[in-house]
Regions:
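Conserved SAM-binding loop
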Residues: 80-81, 86, 90
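Short, amphipathic, aromatic/basic-enriched membrane-interface segments that mark the entry/exit
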Residues: 72-82
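Membrane-anchoring alpha-helices and their flanking helix-loop junctions
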Residues: 1-74, 89-165
């Protein structure tokens, strides 16, 4: 089941990115290239893409090699249950922001939210079956998607497996 979910997730994510590129090619910005809002949207896009890259590497450091075999509830996984999806969401919205088209940003945000909500729901069924009461407690105490920095916990040492970064 986990392999099927992963394959499907990757296919859907690629289709979504192609759609965003297509939208970016055909959506016109309402702002001139030197206008403040144009520059602000571009800067916002670059910041989100950088946060995506950092956040995905950071999250992968904690889950790498343990996905579907252990329930990781510390590090970025203590902030929200799906940090990889959250940081990918930031990256995709950031790429859309680089088009400086408000339409592209809105479409990207809604499309990614819809896609990830569906994927997360399917993955949660698998995790509930695999980890039972421990996953129920994780659901009860940890936000699903948007991070809450009040609960951050991290062990003193984390073993990294570089091939998963």
């Amino acid at each position: 089941m986990a392999v099927k979910l992963n394959k499907n997730r990757m296919q859907l994510s690629r289709l979504l990115m192609l759609g965003i590129v297509f939208i970016g090619l055909f959506c016109r910005t309402m702002f001139g290239e030197k206008e403040a809002l144009h520059e602000t949207l571009e800067l916002f896009g670059y910041i989100l893409v950088c946060l995506c890259a950092f956040g995905r590497v950071y999250s992968s450091a904690f889950i790498g090699g343990k996905k579907n075999t252990a329930l990781i509830t510390w590090g970025p996984y203590s902030l929200c249950r799906n940090p990889l999806y959250f940081f990918s969401f930031l990256g995709i919205v950031g790429i859309a922001a680089l088009t400086t088209s408000v339409t592209a940003i809105a479409i990207a945000a809604v499309a990614v939210w819809f896609l990830y909500d569906q994927l997360i729901s399917r993955e949660e069924v698998f995790l509930k079956e695999k980890f039972g009461a421990a996953f129920d407690e994780f659901v009860r105490t940890t936000p699903r998607f948007f991070p809450s920095f009040r609960r951050y916990t991290c062990p003193d040492e984390v073993t990294l497996q570089p091939k998963y970064l």
